[in-house]
Amino acid sequence: MRFIRNVLQASLPLAALCLLTGCNTVVAGTAVRAPMTSDPTSGHCQEVPAPLMSIEQQRTSEPKLRIPQPPGWQRLRLLDSQLLRYSSRNDDLAARGFAPTAVVTLESTPGTTTDPQQLFDREKAGLSRFGATNLTTSKTTLCGYPAEIVKYTGPPMGNIPARNVTTLEVVAGFDDTTYVATLTIQSSDPDNPTYAQDAKTILTGFQILAPDAA
């Protein structure tokens, strides 16, 4: 707990905190396959073979988020908050003392006219302040919404080694609010074939849907 307090006092982003610590509280449960639906005005989400876990909404006006949960990935709740909505870890794939993690955050800003690129640039600036290096970006879409994939090296911190990190950022507007959902997955052994396949599944199958989606 002392390490967690020290990190908080250093004002690191909450998502970064979970990424650095790997979290340490596991919630038992089994993911259930959710309907493969999307906002009909914005495109279709991609289907993947892993079951989908629905991420709890904190308000009914928020978008619905769903994330694939391949075998061996366990849901964590230690740092769940208004910002950090979901995290999971796979201890079976641990390497160099670090287990791969997947973390989802959700932020919002009033209005729906914000340029998505401005929001993407803000997120990348935050990563640079956090100490990320070797950043590369590529534009994509997720469920029809503008998205960006950022790959980078996460800095070592204490006993936590440097990590290969991929972040998927998606911007979607609903009613009078713009939301930025961020999915980050990382490992200290990115060449592990099981991790590579799991990461692809999680990133490809992540969903952002309208608040009233089935």
Predicted regions and their residues:
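Intrinsically disordered, low-complexity prosegments and terminal tails associated
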Residues: 97, 110, 114, 124-128, ...
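Signature of long, low-cysteine stretches enriched in small and polar/charged residues
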Residues: 118-172
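Extracytoplasmic
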Residues: 60-64, 97-101, 145-147
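Beta-strand elements of well-folded, non-transmembrane domains
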Residues: 108, 156-158, 187
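Short, well-ordered beta-strand elements
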Residues: 102, 177-188
